[in-house]
Amino acid sequence: MAFTLRVYGLLVHEGCVLVSDELIKGQRITKFPGGGLEYGEGLKECLVREIREEIGVEALEVEHFYTTDFFQQSAFHSTPMQVVSVYYTFRVADPMAIPVVQVPFTGITGPGDQEVFRWLRLAGGREEALSLPIDRVVWGMLRGA
């Protein structure tokens, strides 16, 4: 059995949630910020590291929100790989200090992996705005919360 463990952060501010528009292996992906657990790391440590690396801010008041409770095949592995994703809510000292774009994928060019961030309105937003199946489940939970 092969698994990949992913940890994602949910930053909600003024009715919006922060999402990441990323170019990953040539594919345009919109997802919640976060990434893979590294060996020797705890789940919260992973989230704090990922947020620091990706966004350049400290994740504060990290609280568990959801852990995948269904099977999901990884779309990014050539061999069978089950994805287990853990989602945490968090806050930052100044959400408005995070550099964001208004239009998805603005400024992403070239072949290498890249990312930009933007605020996605919860009210009136659609789950289809997110690329990953587990993120779409979490989107529905956020909207209902």
Regions found by a protein language model. Give the residues of each.
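NUDIX/MutT-family hydrolases
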Residues: T89, V100-G140
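Short, catalytically relevant binding-site loops at active-site mouths
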Residues: K25-G26, L37-E38, D69-F71
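N-terminal strand-loop-strand
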Residues: M1-F32, V92
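A generic structural micro-feature
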Residues: M1-F3, I29, S78-V84, P111-Q114
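A structural signal for short, well-ordered beta-strand segments
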Residues: G9, H64, V86-F90
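Active-site-adjacent beta-strand/loop module that shapes the phosphate/pyrophosphate-binding cleft
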Residues: F70-Q102, V137
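The catalytic Nudix box helix
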Residues: F32-Y66
